[in-house]
């Protein structure tokens, strides 16, 4: 590897590891003694997640164990040997769960329709069961910053909700804690890292399902913004960490009926008849001015 390329790779690797470490710390994702089940699909995100957690396991101030789990859903053409060979080479504890969800999905969903929703529900149930069998205290998923932003817009545009993908949550069955250590990582960084590491990627469309058109459109919109307006994606993600319930319209989050004029001036209060002015110019992390334009609490 040439000197310049090696420097670029080291910088990329350090950024991903730093982002993951910060997310883990900010959201209290990993505790001493945790046994973490890392869901490994064979895609760039889950490979990067496992690689990053293996590194952090060596340097973290707390002790935790890892077990990689892959769900073989018996999709046609699934390369069964790829993940075992990779994990054996790494010396990582792992479990391959074989469940023929492919046949169930094909039976229930008409030809040509998107199967992702049913497939996801089936997969989730199997992974929850597996986590219980392995006595895992946390389930780690490989979703990243861009997934979270895409989900925010999907819910706003198509679900009428201001809701994204949380970095940490209790599972819907109430039995598990799910964490997303790559919550701060950029997809473009993960793509570059995955290519540089030459992970043995397994295609995600072996089932033949049509791509989720709504998510595809959101991704195209965000990619367009990222190119046309550098820093907009960074600003969007920072906004997700600076929610002001009193300035939205959800009465379940803020008691608007209780708002009264108390006669006390507040120099930091909002001016009802003035429009907000914005002076912060968010740039991408590749920009030399990035660090000076992001609130300190969002830096490493």
Swiss-Prot record:
UniProt entry tagged with the keyword Iron: yes
Its EC top class is: transferase
Q: Which SUPFAM superfamilies match?
A: Adenine nucleotide alpha hydrolases-like
How many cofactor units bind, and how?
Binds 1 [4Fe-4S] cluster per subunit. The cluster is chelated by three Cys residues, the fourth Fe has a free coordination site that may bind a sulfur atom transferred from the persulfide of IscS.
Keyword terms of this UniProt record: 4Fe-4S, ATP-binding, Cytoplasm, Iron, Iron-sulfur, Magnesium, Metal-binding, Nucleotide-binding, RNA-binding, Transferase, tRNA processing, tRNA-binding
Which Pfam families does this UniProt record tie to the protein?
A: ATP_bind_3
Q: Per the UniProt record, which EC number(s) apply here?
A: 2.8.1.-
Listed pathway(s): tRNA modification
Q: Provide the primary localization.
A: cytoplasm
Q: Which cysteines are joined by disulfide bonds?
A: none
Q: Which reaction does it catalyse?
A: cytidine(32) in tRNA + S-sulfanyl-L-cysteinyl-[cysteine desulfurase] + AH2 + ATP = 2-thiocytidine(32) in tRNA + L-cysteinyl-[cysteine desulfurase] + A + AMP + diphosphate + H(+)
What does the UniProt function comment say about this protein?
A: Catalyzes the ATP-dependent 2-thiolation of cytidine in position 32 of tRNA, to form 2-thiocytidine (s(2)C32). The sulfur atoms are provided by the cysteine/cysteine desulfurase (IscS) system.
Extra remark:
The thiolation reaction likely consists of two steps: a first activation step by ATP to form an adenylated intermediate of the target base of tRNA, and a second nucleophilic substitution step of the sulfur (S) atom supplied by the hydrosulfide attached to the Fe-S cluster.
What is the protein name given in its UniProt record?
tRNA-cytidine(32) 2-sulfurtransferase
Specify the species: Idiomarina loihiensis (strain ATCC BAA-735 / DSM 15497 / L2-TR)
């Amino acid at each position: 590897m040439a000197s310049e390329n090696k420097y670029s790779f080291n910088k990329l690797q350090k950024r991903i590891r730093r982002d993951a470490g910060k997310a883990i710390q900010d959201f209290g994702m990993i505790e001493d003694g945790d046994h973490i089940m890392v869901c490994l699909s064979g895609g760039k995100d889950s490979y990067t997640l496992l690689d990053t957690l293996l590194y952090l396991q060596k340097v973290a101030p707390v002790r935790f164990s890892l077990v990689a789990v892959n769900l073989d859903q018996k999709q046609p053409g699934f390369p069964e040997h790829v993940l075992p060979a990779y994990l054996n080479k790494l010396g990582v504890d792992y479990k391959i769960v074989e469940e023929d969800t492919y046949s169930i999905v094909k039976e229930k969903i008409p030809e040509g329709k998107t199967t992702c929703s049913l497939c996801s529900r089936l997969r989730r149930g199997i992974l929850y069961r597996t986590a219980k069998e392995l006595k895992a205290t946390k389930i780690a998923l490989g979703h990243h910053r861009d997934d979270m932003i895409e989900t925010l817009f999907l819910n706003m545009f198509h679900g009428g909700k201001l809701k994204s993908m949380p970095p940490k949550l209790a599972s819907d069955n109430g039995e598990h804690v799910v964490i997303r250590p790559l919550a701060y990582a950029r997809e473009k960084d993960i793509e570059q890292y995955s290519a540089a590491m030459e992970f043995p990627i397994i295609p995600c469309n072996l089932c033949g399902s049509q791509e989720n058109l709504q998510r595809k459109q959101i991704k195209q919109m965000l990619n367009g913004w990222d190119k046309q307006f550098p820093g907009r994606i960074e600003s969007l993600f920072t906004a997700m960490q600076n929610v002001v319930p009193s300035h939205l319209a959800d009465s379940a989050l803020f008691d608007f009926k209780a708002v009264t004029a108390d006669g006390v001036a507040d120099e930091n209060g909002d001016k009802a008849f003035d429009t907000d002015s914005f002076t912060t110019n968010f740039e991408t992390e590749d920009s030399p001015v990035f660090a000076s334009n992001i609130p300190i609490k969002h830096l490493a």
